[in-house]
Amino acid sequence: MSKLEELDIVSNNILILKKFYTNDEWKNKLDSLIDRIIKAKKIFIFGVGRSGYIGRCFAMRLMHLGFKSYFVGETTTPSYEKDDLLILISGSGRTESVLTVAKKAKNINNNIIAIVCECGNVVEFADLTIPLEVKKSKYLPMGTTFEETALIFLDLVIAEIMKRLNLDESEIIKRHCNLL
């Protein structure tokens, strides 16, 4: 496979995100995700490995916009309660620790969103599933294409929240770390 073919795979995965603007079913999923974020008392995000890094990026951006957002497992993460939202990120949808968190959260409320590549067991606990159906590549190992697409998708979500709430970059700058 040539470098150009690899780039085409990445480009096509990004183009998959167009469906959130061109297909009513996908527009509704995006709107539901954004509505739930805006209405949640607190937002909890969890993923493992590189999906976890993507989750941390998303939690940080939500905090920059003024939301109470937390990455599950950090020492400063508060308890999950009935008015909260849990967003799970898992390429396989079968990661054991993600399933454990989903099971515990389901006993507290039904406000769980799963962002996945493959619809594994985690979707049984989610009341909204967003499958990012990306193409895999021989030279972009394991979940690379999912992780890249998830990062771009979640940045798209941030942009949509900013539009909906009429926020601009100055809101982010106000909450950006200023001690380093």
Curated annotation (Swiss-Prot):
Belongs to the SIS family. PHI subfamily. Keywords: Carbohydrate metabolism, Isomerase. InterPro entries: PHI/rmpB, SIS_dom, SIS_dom_sf. Pathway: Carbohydrate biosynthesis; D-ribose 5-phosphate biosynthesis. The active site is at E147. Substrate binds at S51, S90, G91, S92, G93, R94, T95. This is 3-hexulose-6-phosphate isomerase. NCBIfam families: RuMP_HxlB (TIGR03127). It catalyses: D-arabino-hex-3-ulose 6-phosphate = beta-D-fructose 6-phosphate. Residues 33-167 form the SIS domain. It comes from Methanocaldococcus jannaschii (strain ATCC 43067 / DSM 2661 / JAL-1 / JCM 10045 / NBRC 100440) (Methanococcus jannaschii). The gene is phi. It holds the Pfam family SIS. Catalyzes the isomerization between 3-hexulose 6-phosphate and fructose 6-phosphate. GO terms for biological process: carbohydrate derivative metabolic process. The keyword Isomerase applies.
